[in-house]
Amino acid sequence: MPGIKLTPRDSFDDAYRKFKRQSDRNLIVTEARARQHYETKTEKRKKEKIATRKKILKKLFMLRRYESRL
C-alpha cells in the first residue's frame, strides 16, 4: 500500500495528487483490474503476442519516420 508524507501546509488536493501518483507508480490499479477476472494461459499468450506485434510495429514506424527525415 502506498504511503505518503504530508506537511501541515498540504491541502487535500495535494495529498490526493501525491497518493494517486504513488499508486500509479506501484501499478496497484492495473494489477487489481488484471486480477478481477481469471485469465487462462491461452488468453495470456494471445495478449503477449498482440503486445509484441504492437511493439514491433511501433519500432518499425519510428524507424521509417526517422529514415524519411534523412
Curated annotation (Swiss-Prot):
Q: Which NCBIfam families match?
A: S21p
Record-given protein name: Small ribosomal subunit protein bS21
Identify the keywords attached in UniProt to this record, alphabetized.
Ribonucleoprotein, Ribosomal protein
Provide one Gene Ontology cellular component.
Answer: ribosome
| InterPro entries named among the record's database cross-references | Ribosomal_bS21, Ribosomal_bS21_sf
| GO BP terms, alphabetized | translation
Q: Which residues form a coiled coil?
A: none
TM stretches of this protein: none
Q: Which gene encodes it?
A: rpsU
- Family membership, please give it: Belongs to the bacterial ribosomal protein bS21 family.
